[in-house]
């Protein structure tokens, strides 16, 4: 029963935990705790206890932090099958801790004790978005970094970019008039981009197979106002996304028809 709870066990574990430390276990009387942690991934387990024993644990993954106000800039470039990460230290900790991977289930960790400001990483695959984090720490032995590390910088990186595997989804045509229409779409999902999405290209084809000039839009745009359409004409819109590697497949809208009469 909740009224018989004597306290809580709170375990926090860094991901990845390459030192194979047991999680930090904290005993709490209250149902809140303030942690000063880095932007690394953390796994939290919480259980309650009373005179009869301990409850099952509730598992929680600390969500990703915004990395807009970090002090350092990280740069990544290819070198053969590896990537070289460089940064300019603004202070001199005893070591840097580097995390890299595609997500919390696929993170690697390395402790760097030299003050060179660069490091070579491996284990990269093409067409996958990697997150690279550099943390400064005054503790460099194989022990918990939770109380000691501060994030210096975070960046995202594709070892090799590809073209998007799909086009935008849910392309819809709204507000159709004699000479205009509004096109809306859902952005290409991150896992389908296979590279940094640079933008979209949109054009339309009429019933005579006459194609308009393509308009290039930035990657944050998810709507476009078509103008210069002919009245009483059937059109289809086509949209594709593109990365640094090129343009992906087209998504075609359902046909729509402009009216003969009505507003312009």
Protein language model regions, located:
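Extracellular low-complexity, O-glycosylation-prone stalks/linkers
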Residues: 1-264
């Amino acid at each position: 029963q909740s009224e018989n709870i004597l306290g809580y066990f709170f375990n926090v574990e860094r991901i990845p935990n390459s030192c194979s430390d047991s999680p930090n276990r904290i005993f709490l009387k209250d149902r809140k705790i303030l942690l000063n942690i880095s932007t690394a991934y953390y796994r939290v387990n919480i259980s309650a206890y009373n005179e009869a024993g301990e409850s099952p644990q509730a598992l929680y993954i600390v969500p990703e932090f915004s990395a807009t106000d970090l002090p350092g800039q990280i740069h990544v470039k290819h070198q053969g099958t590896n990537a070289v990460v460089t940064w300019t230290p603004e202070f001199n900790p005893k070591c840097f801790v580097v995390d890299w991977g595609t997500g919390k289930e696929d993170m690697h960790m390395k402790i760097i004790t030299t003050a060179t400001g660069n490091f070579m990483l491996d284990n990269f695959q093409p067409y996958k978005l990697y997150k690279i984090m550099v943390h400064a720490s005054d503790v460099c032995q194989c022990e918990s970094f939770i109380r000691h590390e501060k994030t210096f910088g975070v960046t995202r990186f594709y070892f090799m970019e590809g073209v998007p595997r799909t086009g935008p989804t849910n392309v819809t045509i709204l507000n159709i008039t004699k000479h205009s229409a509004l096109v809306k779409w859902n952005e290409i999902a991150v896992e389908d981009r296979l590279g940094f999405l640079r933008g979209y290209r949109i054009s339309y084809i009429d019933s005579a197979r006459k194609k308009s000039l393509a308009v290039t839009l930035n990657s944050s745009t998810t709507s476009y106002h078509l103008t210069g359409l002919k009245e009483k004409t059937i059109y289809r819109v086509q949209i594709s996304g593109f990365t640094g590697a090129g343009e992906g497949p087209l998504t075609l809208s359902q046909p729509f028809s402009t009216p003969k009469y009505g507003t312009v």
